Amino acid sequence: MKRGGRDSDRNSSEEGTAEKSKKLRTTNEHSQTCDWGNLLQDIILQVFKYLPLLDRAHASQVCRNWNQVFHMPDLWRCFEFELNQPATSYLKATHPELIKQIIKRHSNHLQYVSFKVDSSKESAEAACDILSQLVNCSLKTLGLISTARPSFMDLPKSHFISALTVVFVNSKSLSSLKIDDTPVDDPSLKVLVANNSDTLKLLKMSSCPHVSPAGILCVADQCHGLRELALNYHLLSDELLLALSSEKHVRLEHLRIDVVSENPGQTHFHTIQKSSWDAFIRHSPKVNLVMYFFLYEEEFDPFFRYEIPATHLYFGRSVSKDVLGRVGMTCPRLVELVVCANGLRPLDEELIRIAERCKNLSAIGLGECEVSCSAFVEFVKMCGGRLSQLSIMEEVLIPDQKYSLEQIHWEVSKHLGRVWFPDMMPTW
């Protein structure tokens, strides 16, 4: 009996020990699976890439391992500085302490940088202050964006140029530069070309009054890899188009031209020779030529007098029937047409002519214009299903003997191959 009792006690003891070992093993396994701090840094890095900066900063406080990942160079290649003054903007600004940390610890990691500034001069000055400190980084892209009026233009030109030149000198592989509405000038463009001519592919510099045609020509002559360019019409010249058409230059993919007049009758618009356009389109047959017009009616005389390779036309002010008629005759490559206003004379003949001659037209928008319902249906019928975007206010369409406003939506839908309704003006 005693021996049997001892065996029973031994078995009970062994079972208890096994149970404790099992619980301990389970606890250890559970603690290992739940120890987020031991995750591989590569895994944490991939997760951090999908988090907004603020969430990433909070997560970096979990443990030392996560904090190390937070400061890895891969997370600081791309950054957007938002510089706003509380009195002039409702948008959140990048915290000053974060800016200090970026300059101190990550300036040499930055490659893709943009600055968004509000309308205040202080924000533009802050952007220049940051730019002037980027002496240890080689940027690949830089964008200076004014979210309201162009506040960079309020700065002394020398102050802005000094800050921008720091980036041009230290960046040896700049491929994209967006500096619309800034006081950049010809000498600073020469610095850009001297240091980045082999890598520059995109340059946006609309509304840069201190740049001359010679300044932009210098860029075109040296930056043979340039594929996208945006500038004002006063910088466009026959020499520039020929430089962009040289054998050394790659084929241009996108050329945007802003044709702007602030005061009627005070701006002279020169004429580009047809031979220059012909050479340009032979060299870059697939280029998108985008033109924005903000002119008064009497200033359109130099334009649309012969065939040009425009693909996208936007008229921001009232444009006459005569000009739109010339568009139909001179823009066979037209893909998109937007007319904000025309007046009270119906555009029936002009639309029909555009449909006949512009075989690639796929998008059209009409604002304060007038078109008879019959002419509009005929226009849609001629263009057919290729009209992927058709934005017409209901007030534009004038009922006639053939179609009422109720009937037109069915007829247009039939020719488009999809349901279509005219746009409605909000009641508020």
From Swiss-Prot:
Molecular function in Gene Ontology: ubiquitin-protein transferase activity
PANTHER family, alphabetically?
A: ES1 PROTEIN HOMOLOG, MITOCHONDRIAL, F-BOX AND LEUCINE RICH REPEAT PROTEIN 3
Which sections of the protein are LRR repeats? Answer: 119-146, 181-207, 208-233, 234-259, 316-341, 343-368, 369-394
Record note on quaternary structure: Part of the SCF (SKP1-CUL1-F-box) E3 ubiquitin-protein ligase complex SCF(FBXL3) composed of CUL1, SKP1, RBX1 and FBXL3. Interacts with CRY1 and CRY2 (phosphorylated). Interacts with HDAC3. Interacts with KDM8.
User: What GO CC terms are in its UniProt record?
Assistant: cytosol; nuclear body; nucleus; SCF ubiquitin ligase complex; ubiquitin ligase complex
Compartment(s): Nucleus; Cytoplasm
Keyword Glycoprotein recorded: no
SMART domains given in the database record: FBOX
Q: In which pathway does it act?
A: Protein modification; protein ubiquitination
The record's section on Pfam families has: F-box-like
> What does UniProt note about where in the body, tissue by tissue, this protein is expressed?
Widely expressed.
Could you tell me what this protein does? Answer: Substrate-recognition component of the SCF(FBXL3) E3 ubiquitin ligase complex involved in circadian rhythm function. Plays a key role in the maintenance of both the speed and the robustness of the circadian clock oscillation. The SCF(FBXL3) complex mainly acts in the nucleus and mediates ubiquitination and subsequent degradation of CRY1 and CRY2. Activity of the SCF(FBXL3) complex is counteracted by the SCF(FBXL21) complex.
Biological process per Gene Ontology, one example term: rhythmic process
Identification of the protein by name: F-box/LRR-repeat protein 3
